[in-house]
């Protein structure tokens, strides 16, 4: 989800993802027509636990 994405970006780049990625590509805002399909995907995603020990995502092991 978006919060997990932001956390991953913060860990890897030391930057907050939202100011950098909300204007990335063709983003017309939450609920905008061009992003309707993309926004709907977030309701269908699975949330799971992960860690970044040794910079290896534990879910990839």
From Swiss-Prot:
EC id: 3.1.1.4
Sorted UniProt keywords: Calcium, Disulfide bond, Hydrolase, Lipid degradation, Lipid metabolism, Metal-binding, Secreted, Toxin
Tissue specificity remark: Expressed by the venom gland.
Cysteine pairs bridged by disulfides in the record: 28-35, 41-59
Names of the cofactor(s): Ca(2+)
Catalysed reaction, written as an equation: a 1,2-diacyl-sn-glycero-3-phosphocholine + H2O = a 1-acyl-sn-glycero-3-phosphocholine + a fatty acid + H(+)
UniProt cross-references to Pfam families, sorted A to Z: Phospholip_A2_1
Annotated GO biological process: arachidonate secretion; lipid catabolic process; phospholipid metabolic process
Cofactor comment text: Binds 1 Ca(2+) ion per subunit.
Protein's UniProt keywords contain DNA repair: no
Molecular function in Gene Ontology: calcium ion binding; calcium-dependent phospholipase A2 activity; phospholipid binding; toxin activity
Function, in words: Snake venom phospholipase A2 (PLA2) that displays edema-inducing activities. PLA2 catalyzes the calcium-dependent hydrolysis of the 2-acyl groups in 3-sn-phosphoglycerides.
Subunit annotation: Homodimer.
Name this protein carries in UniProt: Phospholipase A2
Organism of origin: Crotalus atrox
């Amino acid at each position: 989800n978006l919060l997990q994405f932001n956390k991953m970006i913060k860990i890897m780049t030391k930057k907050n993802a939202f100011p950098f990625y909300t204007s990335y590509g063709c983003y017309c805002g939450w609920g905008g027509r061009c992003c309707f399909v993309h926004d709907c995907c977030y309701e269908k995603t699975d949330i799971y636990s992960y860690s970044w020990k040794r910079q290896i995502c534990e879910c990839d092991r």
